[in-house]
């Protein structure tokens, strides 16, 4: 039981620290804009940003937690668990590092943290890349590789914590109960605490300086949150069938033609009256 709990707690704490590391990195990246901020403001960026960092760490810990919970009842060797965790950490490190690097590069041009606004540009990558220079690309590429490697190296020791120990039925129930309790804390972290409102970007805003509020925002949470809200289908806005739409537009067109005809007729009458009124 203990190795499972240790691995999840360690993953959460390490991820939280790595998410918090983005704040001073962002402030250094845009040092010219952070130069006027006081020391308390800079500390506030990290402190207030911990809320969304904690939520993001909770999201990342969910899958390993579920794997550990399932392994209580389905026999899983240490080698298999280690391999699954390595694959998961590699994929997540790639995705997180990519989001962080792209966000860091685009903020200079967009002046807000990465969100679903970027999705339409991904459909036309050639056009989007046409305006990118090596001055923009090289630093973000270095950041992507460096931060991604840091994430994976920090997470990798967790893959060796799990131990496939044979347990009695009572021990399995005890372990399951402990894992479910731990899952409750993860859920609270994802939700952003016990407040009425769940975690959202505005919860980390603490300053009249919008740059500092943006610096406190977690780009991974910002992107996932906005992307989930923007997943609306065309059918969500369709109140009429195609046939009904055609009839409505046809009626509008006919009314418009009649209005144009009447306008022309009245214009001719006014012109005639003006002509006759001339001495």
Which sequence ranges carry the predicted segments?
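Membrane-interfacial interhelical loops
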Residues: 21-52, 85-144, 162-165, 191-221
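Internal/C-terminal transmembrane anchor helices
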Residues: 168-194
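Alpha-helical transmembrane segments and their helix-start/interface "positive-inside/aromatic belt" motifs
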Residues: 1-14, 80-94, 171-176
